[in-house]
Amino acid sequence: KTWPAESVRAAAAAGQRRFGENYVQEGVGKATELSGLGLEWHFIGPLQSNKTRAVAETFAWVHSVDRLKIAERLAEQRPEALPPLQVCVQVNVSNEASKHGVPLDAAGALMMQIARLPRLRLRGLMAIPAPNPDYEAQRRALRPVRELFERLRADGLAIDTLSMGMSHDLEAAIAEGATLVRVGTAIFGERSKAGA
């Protein structure tokens, strides 16, 4: 996010194929501008109902589904000509009302509902814990997500993706079973602050 299409183009030239975006308009613009490069676009930011069509038409993955209404809109708006939209349910690991995501104890029921929707393929869970510089604290924050993921798989839910870990906590996330990490700062550098 906030990096120009030229930065994405340079990373693609170095072999990177998957790119994540937090902001719908910015992501759609980059995906359109770089459409000839065969890149896979992942939407990882909060998603509002009025933005679902643009996401359904542009992105290959959505990591931040936390309400059935959003999943239903994505399913309705995913073009038939495109492969099913790959979806992760975002869980709120900090139990803070200000954070996005469904509570851990409600994720399983939501996932069962999403798994039945057409044009979507439920892939797993996504989490963004509160930043913490301590490795063991990072692992403790992510462990309940891994445990939920394992329980859901044991219960027969066909999921394979645990999307957690960013530049500051990817080692802890991998140790806790992450199958997909979202690394931006370590590749592109610190984002410039608005107005700076």
Regions found by a protein language model. Give the residues of each.
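Gly/Pro- and small hydrophobic-enriched strand-loop and loop-to-helix capping segments
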Residues: 178-196
